[in-house]
Amino acid sequence: QIKVDKVTFSMDSGIPEEHDQNRLPGSFVRVVAAVDLVLTEGLFSSVSTVVTHSNLHGEGFQKVLEFAKSRGIRVDIQIAEPVGKWDGIKEDLITPEDADYIKHLRDTMGQADNGQPMINRDTYCGDNDHCPAGTEFMSISANGELLSCNFLQFSLGNVRDGSIAQKRRDLLTCSWFDNSHRTCICGEDDEFIDRFIVPFKEEAKPLDAYSVFDLPNAWPGRSAQ
């Protein structure tokens, strides 16, 4: 047994044409069919969707919610982040009021069929919402770069070079990675974005986390980049 209990599919909009604009023609129909197949096989499913300030209250997002409710599955909400094609761009990030609206949805939409809240964000941690980057979540890129989060393009070095545990300990000396920040630092914290993302928008990624965050150069064999 592979011990898989849930399969998540991306749904950019509950309007087929809008979803397919971001994917490929016919993609929406295939997502719906895939969700239904997973449920038929007795597994749980969910849909993941990216929200921006401009689409959060739009029809496409509302129809994602309607679809999820009709299937009894969870909606994993990913807020827009100023990275990748949106590197350093802040104009369509969610606002505090948008975040409150998402929390309102979590509190009022009830539970999915597996007993979990219908609405989920990676910052939701019971009564202690916080950014989990580096503390409860890390990412490894395709070529082995260790990142505090898949959205935060600051490398702690390659996993082949030195101890992952030591690199994480180095990261945790920085106060940005201590569970005290109640919002996503990459997508919601203006101070973090203005200090560590906007100034580097034209530079190749990933950046050196040790230099950017002034981390201790603790693990053996590392040389400054």
Enumerate the language-model features and the residues they cover.
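Short, conserved loop/helix-junction motifs that constitute active-site signature segments
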Residues: 1-3
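Flexible mid-to-C-terminal extensions adjoining Fe-S/redox cofactors in radical SAM and related proteins
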Residues: 150-225
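Radical SAM enzyme [4Fe-4S]-AdoMet core and its adjacent flexible, acidic
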Residues: 5-6, 10-134, 142-147, 151
